[in-house]
Design a protein with these regions (language model features):
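Metabolite-binding pocket within alpha/beta catalytic cores that recognizes anionic/polar moieties
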Residues: 1-136
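Short, well-ordered coil/turn segments that N-cap beta-strands
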Residues: 18, 58, 147-148, 188
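Short Gly/Pro-enriched turn/cap motifs at secondary-structure boundaries
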Residues: 43, 189-190
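Active-site rim beta-loop-alpha module in soluble metabolic enzymes
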Residues: 129-186
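Short glycine-rich, acidic/polar surface loops and turns
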Residues: 191-196
């Protein structure tokens, strides 16, 4: 009580930049922050670890979110309360097309909202799509760095094992049918946060 800190992230306005890189694993934050100029530790609470630093003189932050949409939404809501406005999700995913190889960059032009969190924010018919300028900047960067990349729709889900071992689930046939449909629709990859 009386603190200006956000409840879950323990962040204050002067500790974070307007631009935020989000990653699931708290152990990745320091490594990612090492690419920032003058990076420094800001906070560590629950699954939320934060470092800040500079890119071309602009304050930016790296924040872990834990796994899934719900914990990602908590981080984003608190960061938005502090004035953050641009988020870039960096993490792992599972390729759904044979041409998406390990180590390739997947740039999401949209996400299938097969999770429960975003239903609290928008009707399911509303698509989860990124800001066009941010999407374009990602493609431009991948080209500039000559990295193998793919741009397209991805799947965001709540259950890691439900898609990777659907036969172990009571709703096996439903999960398998959806997976097969997404593959036929040329979905690039599957993960758990980007639709948030």
């Amino acid at each position: 009580e009386g603190s200006n800190k956000q409840y879950h992230t323990q962040l204050e306005e002067n500790g974070v930049g307007d631009y935020v890189i989000l990653t699931g694993d708290p152990k990745r934050v320091k490594d990612i922050a090492s690419y920032l100029d003058d990076a420094y530790f800001v906070a560590d609470n629950r699954e939320y670890v934060t470092y800040s630093g500079y890119i071309n003189g602009v304050l930016c932050s790296v924040v872990s979110t834990g796994i899934g949409g719900a914990s990602t939404a908590i981080a984003m809501e608190e960061l938005i309360q502090l004035g953050c406005h641009t988020f870039l999700r960096v993490g792992t995913c599972g390729g759904m097309r044979l041409d998406v190889q390990g180590g390739d960059i997947v740039i999401a032009s949209g996400a299938i909202r097969q999770e429960g969190t975003t239903r609290e924010y928008a009707p399911i018919e509303f698509p989860a799509v990124p800001n066009f300028e941010v999407l374009s900047a990602q493609v431009e960067s991948a080209n500039k760095l000559n990295l193998p990349y793919h741009v397209g729709v991805i799947q965001s889900k709540d259950s890691f094992f439900g898609q990777h071992a659907p036969e172990t689930m009571p709703v096996y046939q439903e999960l398998q049918n959806k997976w097969d449909a997404y593959c036929r629709l040329d979905c690039l990859a599957s993960e758990m946060e980007s639709s948030t």
